[in-house]
Regions:
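Sec-dependent signal peptide recognition
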Residues: 1-7
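Lipid interaction determinants
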Residues: 5, 14-116
């Protein structure tokens, strides 16, 4: 289960992102990127709604959570099965159809998710 934590918005094997990545600093810009889309990687499919909910599945487990935008960071809490993951504020970068989430306000592990 600990592995699931890192895959979901923190990291395991992240694909490389080119240096043209641009930081997403605005809630409205973030919502425009994810609204009506899924965020995916191997074994993971998530939806992030404009209303502040997170849902989906990862490695056969249901994922639920909430998110807010706070001072330029995506801040989320999540639950996978019966495990609750505390709030973590993450720096978000965009490169084409990919988003990179960097935990701990940009100082932590990364997770790359494709926008579909």
């Amino acid at each position: 289960m600990r592995t699931l934590i890192f895959v979901l918005f923190t990291a395991l094997a992240s694909s490389a992102m080119a240096e043209e990545s641009a930081r997403v600093t605005d809630r409205g810009a973030f919502v425009n990127l994810v609204q009506g889309k899924s965020l995916t990687s191997l074994g993971v499919r998530l939806t992030v709604s404009p209303s502040g909910s997170i849902g989906g599945r990862a490695f056969g487990r249901d994922i639920s959570g909430t998110w807010t935008w706070n001072n330029g960071y995506f801040c989320r809490t999540m639950q996978a099965g019966d495990r609750v993951f505390p709030r973590n504020c993450q720096l978000v970068q965009q490169n084409g159809n990919r988003l990179r989430f960097i935990a701990d306000k940009g100082a932590g592990a990364t997770a790359d998710l494709r926008i579909r």
